[in-house]
Amino acid sequence: MTNIRKTHPLLKIVNHSLIDLPTPSNISTWWNFGSLLGLCLMIQILTGLFLAMHYTSDTATAFSSVTHICRDVNYGWLIRYLHANGASMFFICLYMHVGRGIYYGSYTYLETWNIGIILLFAVMATAFMGYVLPWGQMSFWGATVITNLLSAIPYIGTTLVEWIWGGFSVDKATLTRFFAFHFILPFIIAALVMIHLLFLHETGSNNPSGIPWDSDKIPFHPYYTIKDALGFLMLILMLMLLVLFSPDLLGDPDNYTPANPLNTPPHIKPEWYFLFAYAILRSIPNKLGGVLALVMSILILAIIPFLHMSKQRSMMFRPISQVLFWILVADLLTLTWIGGQPVEHPFITIGQVASILYFSIILILMPLVSLVENKILKW
């Protein structure tokens, strides 16, 4: 008798994507981050749902409702900190996942890669709007500064900003709509994840060598289900260590002060996972130029597949490209550090050098080095 998982219309889909899926036998731990992102999304949706049951999106009561969640709701503090630190884990996994894609040439799966970029933008938008909801000082001023960037768009900028605000400043209307968007976006993200997986399963997974090897595929279950389970365990362990021992480690103390439009904090900065982009934005003295650089710092990922000059897909056997890749990682860490520093000497110069280096590595150096490597290998 045929197994029900192979005949039932719904179970068949699960079977083809999680059980009998032919998977390369040599994929490393770097391939764990996809499933970890799925776990992060589930944690965020669940904790977010319970937070939304007690939160009020009104400027007068938003801050107190978050305080009430932490003090009066059963395990409210746990739900709140799981949600806040869960976002940090989400971005750690996201950046690792994208880094893996660049290192091993997974960007040659164009549809999967492009949906991934849309997902990255959607998650960033969701995180930004979520940061506004507690209505602390950094929430308010972060929302003011970032939405104000749109005023750099010629002709329609100012009108666009006021339209997003729902008034002439960040106020009740802004908070309410941000809450609405913050609630709906994760479900849109979940739908996009399905499309991301659909396109991935059209081609099958890439592997560290970058060489397609259909004769050496193994079933996803039990080999990779157990491997993913180990990843889940490690992620939950790290998240719990963060939540239970230092829940405010990655947050900003200013956000424990209720929003006050009359008092600007000395240093306005976003959460740590946006600091690299914020540093690139600040490194350009012109407002429109800065906004374009900010958008391009992420959108540049869409150009990467067209700059692939190497005859090999993966960087596994390309030592010069590997060095360049790790310089890029170090550069991004430098930008993250600079984004959290005040705008003064020497941080301004370091930020500008790091920003130029970031774009130079991706747009100029990586394609050139690939051509040199081809030459060395007499290809």
Swiss-Prot record:
Where mainly found? mitochondrion
Q: Where in the cell is it found?
A: Mitochondrion inner membrane
Q: Which Gene3D superfamilies match?
A: Cytochrome Bc1 Complex, Chain C
The note on the cofactor says:
Binds 2 heme b groups non-covalently.
Can you tell me which family this protein belongs to? Answer: Belongs to the cytochrome b family.
What does the further note read?
A: Heme 1 (or BL or b562) is low-potential and absorbs at about 562 nm, and heme 2 (or BH or b566) is high-potential and absorbs at about 566 nm.
General function of this protein: Component of the ubiquinol-cytochrome c reductase complex (complex III or cytochrome b-c1 complex) that is part of the mitochondrial respiratory chain. The b-c1 complex mediates electron transfer from ubiquinol to cytochrome c. Contributes to the generation of a proton gradient across the mitochondrial membrane that is then used for ATP synthesis.
What protein name is recorded for this chain? Answer: Cytochrome b
Source organism per entry reads: Lepus sinensis
User: Organism classification, top ranks?
Assistant: Eukaryota, Metazoa, Chordata, Craniata, Vertebrata
Q: Which gene encodes it?
A: MT-CYB
